[in-house]
UniProtKB/Swiss-Prot annotation:
Gene: cox16
Entry protein name: Cytochrome c oxidase assembly protein cox16, mitochondrial
Similarity remark: Belongs to the COX16 family.
Membrane topology: Single-pass membrane protein
UniProt-listed InterPro entries: Cyt_c_Oxase_assmbl_COX16
GO CC annotation: mitochondrial inner membrane
Source domain of life: Eukaryota
One GO-annotated biological process of the protein: mitochondrial cytochrome c oxidase assembly
Length: 134
């Protein structure tokens, strides 16, 4: 008698077998004969159905974003200081809005800063955290 018999092991079907076990056994028995019909086709159907389900969800996502981002009215733009310099038809400029001049002016302003004399300061570490010193 060979060490590994050619007959496959099957559990004895008893009355205590549930419907799920019977269906699983029938599925596993038919799967090698019809792999595309029993595995590939359901997989493709799930992918296609998922795309139909997710399409409205992504549309909803972009609609919510569009509701948040809206075009400013002229009055709101004036309140933010986005239109017109001071004195132009009574429009006031927002003092917090930074207006940068031309590039040359910005270059000279940055060059005037003293970048050579600075000191590195260490940040206070949490207890037990290594500070990186050797």
């Amino acid at each position: 008698m060979p060490a590994f018999p050619s007959k496959t092991y099957r559990r004895a079907t008893t009355a205590s077998s549930t419907l799920g076990e019977k269906l699983g056994e029938a599925y596993r028995a038919r799967l090698p004969r019809h792999p595309f019909l029993l595995f590939g086709l359901p997989f493709i159907m799930v992918i296609v159905a998922g795309s139909f389900v997710l399409t409205p969800a992504t549309a909803l996502r972009y609609e919510r974003y569009d509701r948040k981002v809206k075009q400013l009215s002229q009055e709101e733009a004036m309140d933010l200081g986005l239109k017109g310099p001071d004195g132009e038809e009574g429009i006031k400029r927002n003092p917090r809005r930074r207006i940068i001049g031309d590039d040359r002016e910005e270059y000279y302003r940055l060059m005037a800063k003293d970048l050579d004399s600075w000191e590195q300061k260490r940040v206070q570490r949490f207890k037990g955290e290594p500070d990186g010193r050797l």
